[in-house]
């Protein structure tokens, strides 16, 4: 079996807060097909906020893959899962496929803000 590395680019984005909120993600993750990728998104007390994850392939609009920390929209494979237990939210993609190569964005929604 050939080892095919996939580059999962990562970008962080924060919305819904009137104050500045900083998110941190690694710049990229390289994973072999059929392996598992864990993509993290860190922020102060991020566990108290709703985290959403988007996948964007070149030339395409972003696709929501996880919403409200761990919920999967209809049509998203079970290989995609999310968790948000504290100061780090995680998107996990099991059994990586070539089609998973994309940019992944974490987005935080602070429901305590009306902005």
From Swiss-Prot:
Pfam families in alphabetical order: V-set
Residue segments, region Framework-3: 71-106
Region annotated Complementarity-determining-2, chain positions: 68-70
Location within or outside the cell: Secreted; Cell membrane
UniProt-listed GO biological process terms: adaptive immune response; immune response
Chief subcellular location: secreted
Domain spans labelled Ig-like: 21-115
Key words, A-Z: Adaptive immunity, Cell membrane, Disulfide bond, Immunity, Immunoglobulin, Immunoglobulin domain, Membrane, Secreted, Signal
Signal peptide: 1-20
GO cellular component terms given for this protein: extracellular region; immunoglobulin complex; plasma membrane
Domain of life: Eukaryota
Disulphide bonds in the chain: 41-106
Region: Complementarity-determining-3, residue numbers: 107-115
SUPFAM superfamilies, per the entry: Immunoglobulin
Species: Homo sapiens (Human)
Protein name, as recorded: Immunoglobulin lambda variable 3-12
């Amino acid at each position: 079996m050939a080892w095919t590395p996939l580059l999962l680019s990562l970008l962080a984005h924060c919305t819904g807060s009137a104050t500045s909120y900083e998110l941190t993600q690694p710049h990229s993750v390289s994973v072999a097909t059929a392996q598992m990728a864990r993509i993290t998104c860190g922020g102060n007390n991020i566990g108290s906020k709703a985290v959403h994850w988007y996948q964007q392939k070149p030339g395409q609009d972003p696709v929501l893959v996880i919403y409200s920390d761990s919920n999967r929209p209809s049509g998203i494979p079970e290989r995609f899962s999310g968790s948000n237990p504290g100061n780090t939210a995680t998107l996990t993609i099991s059994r990586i496929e070539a089609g998973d190569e994309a940019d992944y964005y974490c987005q935080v929604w602070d429901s305590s803000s009306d902005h």
